[in-house]
């Protein structure tokens, strides 16, 4: 069975992404009307049902009461911040957070008997839902080169095997070290130290596929790639724009903050191609009015924008603000802020006003309407809201970041905020809403293929070595390097690289070309089924579990989406006696690797010395000197033999001590962790209206709206999550807010578009993406569903549709896959009515 194919001019189609039991799973697919509100009693019911099924009653109560509490553990789900400790509820988690906890704290186990029963081919034919549902991984497993099954392996043997492969590489750049956003600060820090001590900056991470565009745009405009608001700022805003984001599914606890905005008199505008339930009304299950009442209407205005039209929208808003300033000088534009703190304003104004006529950034009113799908009156209404607001926050997520023009779009929304001085004052600013719980912290710890010189200088000074300076590989470039034979060893610290990445056929072939792939994981996923010639699964502790090392119980830390750092302490007994923490795994692997490199060095020196004995005394002296030089240069690999990896793995406070001397803002790290709720990292634009850009000022930028041509008979597709899903983890087969139950292979299309294409509602179709080089990619057997999405646009779930995303389809400057703007056509599925 096949769920996707890719072909080019030659017409050759390659099978990818085995569908396994997908057709069986989708046999119960049912479609109903989308919901008009989110959460409420059903949310509580679904959370409890999942928890009780996976964990049982006592375990559920014991675990859920500790989620996001000051002395508990950080939810392994999203990165939305917690309220101050005194303001937290007893149930400071959402429905999807409860699902994430249940997935990790499940009583089910994946044992050696499971792997003996299921071959790799069998596993590769299963769905992500089935794989994740098997339970927790409990012992290291090894797939010998080209073997059909995994077999048990000891930790020492696993470390030795990996170390041997790494030591045998011709260059450290033949290895790549991927990081998932669940990884703690402590694990991320030693992981990047290990990679750089080895001699490479190949540190791709999940941020490359999501908010890399945000970091790139914000660094170039305000000097720091993080959001500028706190939770208190958001809740004090007069106007909040929620753009390209579905908080009800992806960040449900954000809804409580949006409710506070409304109850304080603020206004909310939602900008999105889909009318998501949570953008319309929220029934807060923490309050009686949310359970038995109607809840709170959230969006005062809903702009159903066309995919990719956001840049044109923000330019149109900028033009309207400038025109309003002309009509009433000194009442709209914050000239004092602009003069004191910004650069590029005059160029921005010239670009937006163009020739002085009614055009905006070179676009006519008709072109703006075509790009956005909005009327001039709708844009006027939003501009009016901005004119009357004193404090504006713009929130966004993947709906902005995964387009070819994503970086320019985010720069443009910064332009609009700068016009009114809405950066660096209370209740105003930028709010990129991060996904995985510590994805922002991992970047702070140095998980980045393009580290700054300042970070490398500090790291080198702390550990006494010269870190590599050449930039490494991000996710897309790692796939290319594996495909081309330039990366031979892949190590994944959490996550599900194979399922999360674009162009499934290319990615899976690239992974299979590796000599060794290593996955550090809690549960089974597709990256354990599609592997290199040899593969290892290293099972790790989850957030919910107690981490006890030789120095005693440990705590780890995370950084939320607003730059707050706090501790996380699991309490449950580990799922298996052989589980090791991520920190212990990294430190054990580093110890074994540098020992292997030292042996290699010694062997090289011995060989040189043996050759010298057969030569003249003078030649022998020269050869011995050469051998000594070899001994000194082979571990140019960092000269980190002096790092006490064992000690770091046994006491995480020692890691935090190193972090405090390397990473700005972590002074007195250990002491400040004791503060209730943790501590905030410095953010110059927010804290003091200072901007660490080359000019020392915030930058207005000039951006051109990208032209995206959609041929007749085609649609623009965005890939989305279901409500029973977190990233690539599939908890169930329902997406109840959108009225989809019992299956995932659906494509949501506007009824007018279905009629124009001659496709009846309920028809089974293949999705065929069309790339600029003429190649096509196919995802088979999706049910077309009539749905009120923006006209000309469609939506379908990932990872099933990742096969449609060309590897070369990336955002300019950030190299993020453009999963929100794929040109597709619908073709009838063979053999299905």
What function would you assign to each model-found segment?
Residues 84-85:
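Short, non-ligating residues that shape and space the ligands of small metal-coordination modules
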Residues 72-78:
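Short cysteine-rich clusters marking metal-coordination/redox-active sites
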Residues 102-149:
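Low-complexity, highly charged intrinsically disordered N-terminal segments
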Residues 52-62:
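Short Cys/His-rich Zn2+-coordinating modules
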Residues 608, 613, 617-618, 622:
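Low-complexity tandem-repeat tracts in intrinsically disordered regions
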Residues 15-45, 135-437, 459-605, 610, ...:
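Cofactor-pocket helix-loop regions in the catalytic cores of large enzyme subunits
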Residues 63-69:
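Short, flexible, mixed-charge glycine/proline-rich loop motifs
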Residues 672-813, 819-821, 826-833:
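Long, compositionally biased stretches
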């Amino acid at each position: 069975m096949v769920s996707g194919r890719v072909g080019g001019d030659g017409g050759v189609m390659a099978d990818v992404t085995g569908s396994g039991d997908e057709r069986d799973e989708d046999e119960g697919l049912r479609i109903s009307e989308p919901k008009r509100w989110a959460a409420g009693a059903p949310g509580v019911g679904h959370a409890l049902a999942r928890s009780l099924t996976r964990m049982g009653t006592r375990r559920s109560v014991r675990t859920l009461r500790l989620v996001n509490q000051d002395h508990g553990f950080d939810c392994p789900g999203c990165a939305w911040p917690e309220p101050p400790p005194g303001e937290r509820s007893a149930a400071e988690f959402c429905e999807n957070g409860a699902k994430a906890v249940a997935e990790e704290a499940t009583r089910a186990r994946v044992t050696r008997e499971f792997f003996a029963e299921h071959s790799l081919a069998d596993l590769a034919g299963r769905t992500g839902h089935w794989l994740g549902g098997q339970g927790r991984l409990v012992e290291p497993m090894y797939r010998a080169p080209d073997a059909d099954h995994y077999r048990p392996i000891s930790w020492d043997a696993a470390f030795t095997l990996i170390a041997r492969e790494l030591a045998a590489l011709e260059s450290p750049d033949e290895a790549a070290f991927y990081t998932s956003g669940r990884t703690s600060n402590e694990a991320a820090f030693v992981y990047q130290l290990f990679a750089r001590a080895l001699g490479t900056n190949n540190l791709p991470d999940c941020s490359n596929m999501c908010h890399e565009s945000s970091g790139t745009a914000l660094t170039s405009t305000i000097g720091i790639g993080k959001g500028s608001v706190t939770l208190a700022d958001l809740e004090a805003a007069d106007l909040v724009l929620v753009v390209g984001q579905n908080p009800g599914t992806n960040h449900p606890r954000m809804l409580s903050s949006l409710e506070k905005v409304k109850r304080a008199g603020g206004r909310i505008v939602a900008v999105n191609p889909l009318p998501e339930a949570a953008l319309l009304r929220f029934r807060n299950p923490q309050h009686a009015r949310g359970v038995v009442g109607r809840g709170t209407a959230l969006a005062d205005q809903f702009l159903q924008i066309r995919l990719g039209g956001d840049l044109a929208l923000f330019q149109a808003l900028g033009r309207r603000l400038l025109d309003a300033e002309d009509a009433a000088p000194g009442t709209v534009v914050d000239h004092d802020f602009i003069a004191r703190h910004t650069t590029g304003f005059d160029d921005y104004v010239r670009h937006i006003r163009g020739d002085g006529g009614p055009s905006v950034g070179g676009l006519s009113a008709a072109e703006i309407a075509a790009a956005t799908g909005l009327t001039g009156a709708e844009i006027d209404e939003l501009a009016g809201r901005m004119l009357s607001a004193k404090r504006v926050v713009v929130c966004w997520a993947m709906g902005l970041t995964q387009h070819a023009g994503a970086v320019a779009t985010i720069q443009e929304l910064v332009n609009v905020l700068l016009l009114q001085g809405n950066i660096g004052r209370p209740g105003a600013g930028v709010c990129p809403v991060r996904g995985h719980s510590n994805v922002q912290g991992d970047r702070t710890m140095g998980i980045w293929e393009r580290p700054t010189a300042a970070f490398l200088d500090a790291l080198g000074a702390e550990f006494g070595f010269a870190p590599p300076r050449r930039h490494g590989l991000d996710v897309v470039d790692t796939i290319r390097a594996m495909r081309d034979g330039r990366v031979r060893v892949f190590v994944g610290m959490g996550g599900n690289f194979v399922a999360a990445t674009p162009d499934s056929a290319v990615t899976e072939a690239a992974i299979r070309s590796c000599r060794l792939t290593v996955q550090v994981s809690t549960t089974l996923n597709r990256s354990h089924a599609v592997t290199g010639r040899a593969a290892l699964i290293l099972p790790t502790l989850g957030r919910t579990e107690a981490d006890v090392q030789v120095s005693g119980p440990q705590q780890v830390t995370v950084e939320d989406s607003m730059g707050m750092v706090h501790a996380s302490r699991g309490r449950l007994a580990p799922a298996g006696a052989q589980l090791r923490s991520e920190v212990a795994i990294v430190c054990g692997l580093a110890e074994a690797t540098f020992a292997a490199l030292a042996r290699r060095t010694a062997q090289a020196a011995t060989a040189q010395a043996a050759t010298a004995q057969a030569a003249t005394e003078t030649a022998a002296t020269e050869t011995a000197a050469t051998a000594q030089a070899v001994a000194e240069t082979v571990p140019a690999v960092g000269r980190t033999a002096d790092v006490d990896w064992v000690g770091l793995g046994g006491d995480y406070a020692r890691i935090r001590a190193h972090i405090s001397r390397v990473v700005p803002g972590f002074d007195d790290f250990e002491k400040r962790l004791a503060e209730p709720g943790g501590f905030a990292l410095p953010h110059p634009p927010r804290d003091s209206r200072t901007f660490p850009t080359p000019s020392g000022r915030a930058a207005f930028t000039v951006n051109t709206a990208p032209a995206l041509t959609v041929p007749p008979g085609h649609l623009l597709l965005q890939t989305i999550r279901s409500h029973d899903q977190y990233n690539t983890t599939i908890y169930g087969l329902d997406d109840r807010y959108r009225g989809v139950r019992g299956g995932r292979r659906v494509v949501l299309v506007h009824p007018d578009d279905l009629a124009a294409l001659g496709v009846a509602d309920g028809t089974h179709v293949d999705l065929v993406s069309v790339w600029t080089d003429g190649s096509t990619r196919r995802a088979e057997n999706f049910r077309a569903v009539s749905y009120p999405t923006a006209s000309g646009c469609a939506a379908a779930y990932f990872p099933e549709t990742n096969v449609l995303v060309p590897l070369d389809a990336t955002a300019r400057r950030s190299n993020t896959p453009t999963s929100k703007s794929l040109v597709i056509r619908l073709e009838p599925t063979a053999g299905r009515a």
